[in-house]
Amino acid sequence: DAKALLESIARSFGYIYGREHNVRVNTISQSPTFTTAGSGVKGMDKLYDFANRMSPLGNASADECADYCIVMFSDLTRKVTMQNLFHDGGFSSVGMSLRAMATYEKGLDEYKDENGNIIYG
């Protein structure tokens, strides 16, 4: 998984560059966000809507993510390093809920092929 690799690299570089150059290295896991790159992903609008409804604070916008990144450059976070920081309105910590179950009950028929198998991607 590419994200796991990126997080591992950040931890390794965070240790090396932290010790040798006092540099902090972190990753940020953002809410689903509408971007040019993401516009070609099938079902992105539904993923965005699902995450927005499931997140206690809703999805974070691209501008809010930019603000969060700016905060990470401040001296107020000078001891934060080698971390994957979630900026997703709480979505990553939400388990199954009544709201999620109601969403799943609606079915995935539009994401199935002619044999009834779910199409991933």
Residue positions per predicted region:
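Alpha-helical segment proximal to the catalytic Tyr-Lys
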Residues: 15-19, 78
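Glycine-rich nucleotide cofactor-binding loops and adjacent beta-alpha elements
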Residues: 20-34
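Short beta-loop-alpha junction of Rossmann-like oxidoreductase domains
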Residues: 31-43, 96
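Active-site helix of classical SDR
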Residues: 2, 10
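A short, polar/charged loop-to-alpha-helix boundary motif
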Residues: 95-107
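Residues immediately C-terminal
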Residues: 92
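C-terminal helical subdomain
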Residues: 23, 27, 45-80, 85-89, ...
